[in-house]
Amino acid sequence: MAIRYGTDASETINGDNTADMVFAGGGNDTVNGKFGGDQIFGDVGNDTLDGGFQNDMIDGGEGADKIYGGSGDDMLAGGLGADTLTGDLGDDIFTVGELTELTGDKIDGGIGRDTMMISFEDSAKGITFTAADPTKSTSFYGATITGIEQFFITGSDKAADNLTGGRWTDMLTGGGGDDRLTGNGGTDILSGGLGNDILSGGQGSDMLSGDEGDDQLSGSYGHDTLEGGTGNDKLDGGNGIDFLKGEAGNDTLLGGNGMDTLDGGEGNDTIDGGADNDTITAGAGLDKVIAGSGNDTVKMTINQGKDTVDGGTGTDRIDISGISGTFTAKAANLTNTLSDGTTIINIEDYTLRGSSGTDKFTTLGGTDYLYGEGGNDTLKAGAGNDFVYGGIGNDAIYGEDGNDYLDAGKGKDIISGGTGTDTAVIDASDLGTTAVTFSVSGNKGTLSNGTTTTDVEIYKITTASGNDVLKAGTAQQVVFNTGKGNDQLFGGNGSDQLNAGEGNDKIDGGAGNDTISDTGGNNTITAGDGNDTVTVDVLAASAGGDKTTVDLGTGNDRVEFNDGIGSTAGVFTANGGTGTDHAVIDRSKSTANLTFTLGTHAVLTNGNVTLDNFESVTIKGGSGKDVFKGGNLNDTFMGNAGDDDLQGLGGNDLLYGGAGKDKLTGGDGNDSIWGNNGSDDAAADTLSGGNGNDNLYINNGDTASGGTGTDSLYLDLSNVTTGVSFNFGTGTVKVNGTTSFTEMERLDFKGTTSNDTVKGGTLNDVLRGNAGNDVLDGNSGDDTLYDGKGNDTLKGGEGNDTLIREDFTGKDIFDGGNGTDTLSFAISGDTSVKLDLLNNALNDGMALGLTVTSIEKVIGSGKDDDIAGANVAEQIFGGDGGDALNGRGGNDTLNGGLGADKLTGGTGNDTFVFDDYSSAGDFVTDFKRGEDKIALDLSEFGLASNYKLLLVQGADPVATTTGATFFYETDTNRLWYDADGNGGDEEMHLVATFDKVASLSTSDFLFV
């Protein structure tokens, strides 16, 4: 950030294209921030301060100052004196330190969602304030304001305030006294402070805080958050999905419509969930809970008060913590009394969280959650799909009817699933080296620690480090997880997961699509029928002379093993069996010269891997000179270091040469071939695509041949310091003394750090200049060209090309050529764009030094831009930020994008596109009915493709249906959108203001 200091004399200080900090000093100064987010301090004197582009902070100081925010979200303070403050484009904030600073000020927020921040906390009198329509000028404590949408106001600490917001987001703080705060539209923040306050959010998703006192909070429409604070408060959520928290005091909480969350907090509270599915928490105190209609959940902790709970209609749940001893649920229409005197009625589902002692819970129908925690518990879930957790101890768990999930935890447990498809979870991880056996016969399962099961279909069992034998038997499905030890795992007919740890293991998957993993040891794995996946990790034990044999059986299977495999201490043998099978071999740590040719019987020479009946492979080589040959399907070979020879043969193969002088041959199929692994490689690689549409990636020193098909060359010379010059063609092209290619149809080029001259081919090429004074010519096709640093010349040629400016330090020439060509600043970083297609001498910011011809479409940056077209038809898209777009002559299409934009079509039949209404709306300066059109993006407005425009207009237009409606205010020239018409739940959103346009009709609109 450049820091600039003025003197006490009157002077002019100009910023640059970066962020400046300017202290103007005394005198009547003129300061122009220009580009960048500037900080400007006027000090004493009648100053003229202009922030220019981006988000500026300007303080006028003493004197009658003229302050212009320019584009961007600016923060403006006039200081003492009769000041003129203009926000212009962007969401600006006007701050006032003392009320006397407002005297004589003229404040205009301009275009955007602008905010006035002011505090009256020292006022002896209460403040009465109502936000005015921003289109109208109004007197405000000695100032004249217009164009202010939002107010952040702090009321008096000494008296009662009455503060009312507008259609946008307001922040109103009451201070002392019994205040009345009304948010109206927008996402408002209301804080009552001291006193007995009345807060109403209105439309929008508001946040209301009563703070101290006996407060009344009403959310009304929207998804609101209401917090009562201390005192006996009344909270009413209204419509929407609301969060209500009573906090301390005897509070009344009303959820209203919507799926609300209500928390009474401390005190004797009355909580009414209202309609929909609510979540209610009864805290400490004697609470009365009426869940209302819907499927509600009531949460409570026993012994915090004698509560009354009525679930109301719907399927309701009660969640009770700290319950101990015996509890038996009753029918929903009967009253159930807890040990602390709490009564429950109209509850269908239970969540019971037990104690460390011996608990006995019995529930009826419904979906119940029972937690035994510690102790020897008896848990009976009854009918329904239940979840039961025994915890530590010797528990008896009964799922009974339904598809139940029964987690016994640690201990000697009894598990009974009952009818339905039930799952048992057994944790034997505390048994250490003790061998564990498990088997299922008929409807009974037996674990050697004494745990028994009855009528369970699915098992999940975890053991420790003994020599375990786990058999699925007649189970539908199993998940076995064993640790160290010589284990035997047998799957069943389902899709099982069998995971063995270190040790000499035997695994049989059985039928079904199984997932099998093993770690270390001399292992025998039989996958069985089905499409199985086997992963072997012997890295930790590769020094122990391990041997692993895998038989995948029938099905389309996959086997994978890590870079420990193939060391001199380990041997791996796999048979794919029938089906289409794939093997993944990681030998990236090997130093040997590996060779492999895929076939019915294939051996990874020097890698101790044998594969039979595999149809495709993925192999990662090490630092040796590897030779890998694939088959007819899709193979992946990674050579890594060393001079490798990789041949894909048939299929769509992926070949990565890595470091070294590699020879890479794709063969048939659409292959992708990298001479390196995504990084620079000084060695000279030879790449051959063969038949098919191939992608070849090379850098300096490599040779590439595409072969037949439509092949793409990705040439990266970004680390080369000597420039190149070549024309892309079908014959042999010599890029420099060491790099060449032939039989390529498409080019993706990254230039050197010096001066490059490159001409593309007939297809859609990508040319990146990098550093240096480059000349890039796309030739024909729809090409994409990037300038980079230096004085560059970009020529699109034939086709619909895109020319992208990444750097503004050079003097560049962009010529789109024939076709509909695009100039884009979309990836230009943090600098705004000032572009004039008619007078390039005015170009500045990211367009500084740029000469442009034959451009039909412009895409701005992610900041606030000023873009003016020529006297021909153009498409101009502003992108993010508050943009100023001017089409000038021709039939132009203007789209401001995100942010509140200023749009001027100029002469011709222009189209104004609106695909966002999240800001304060765009401002159209010259819409002409009968010539220009308003284009609405249906998808961005959430409208169906067959939507028929519903337009209501007048001085105060009122919706006639609950359907999506557009409103045009004839007195303010504003176009609004309401997704639900007169439904009330959705707010109206400002789309645009059309200057001096008295009315609109449906014929002025079109959909895109």
Predicted regions and their residues:
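Solvent-exposed adhesion/ligand-recognition segments of exported proteins
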Residues: 1, 7, 12, 16, ...
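Low-complexity acidic/polar repeat-biased segments
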Residues: 1-2, 143-152, 161, 344-351, ...
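Consensus positions within tandem repeat domains that build extended binding/scaffold surfaces
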Residues: 10, 19, 28, 37, ...
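Short "repeat-start/strand-capping" segments in structured domains, especially the N-termini
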Residues: 17-20, 36, 147-151, 167-170, ...
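Acidic/polar low-complexity surface segments
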Residues: 96-97, 123-142, 328-342, 429-451, ...
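Acidic glycine/aspartate-rich repeat arrays in secreted/surface proteins
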Residues: 122-126, 134, 139, 323-328, ...
